[in-house]
């Protein structure tokens, strides 16, 4: 994970649906994520491991099925799930949202995990933990952590597992209870099951926007500096 600058604290919230939901149990815990040569505290709400004694290894059949599910995702699957017209509408909603607060919202849609993460999932680490690390990696690559008020938020959608994570920088996460993040993620998770990505992403965006307006409203005469690109990221 390549996070530059000072160590930043973020809250990662995962709500699994579909195949992932059958493999994990909800817990609340605290972990550490390497940030260059420093560490940032990460609060995890949701499902972080399989039920029982925490055994990470899974059957060869299950591991193989996941591998093929990810590798057989159609070319440009992210663009098909969120086509250009939908992406433009989502970008317009982000633009409108950021006229009301000083935060930054980034939407990232990824078709499948890369091979190195697929190999680790269920063998070296639980699948939800691998997905969480992937979301945190995008949080760093897209520089969502690098905002003036530490109030950037990443909404990350992994199509192959139909699951979502919201990663928020410390400026906003310290103001917002876990229950609020869970509600935002659940709103998207319910629509993922039916493939209604537009409605789900819009609802999640509205939830995040409302929290940013509440805690980081723009004052009279102020303008959002738009520190990060508002276009949907297809990965």
Regions found by a protein language model. Give the residues of each.
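Periodic low-complexity repeat segments enriched in small/acidic residues
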Residues: 1-61
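Divalent-cation
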Residues: 56-225, 230-234
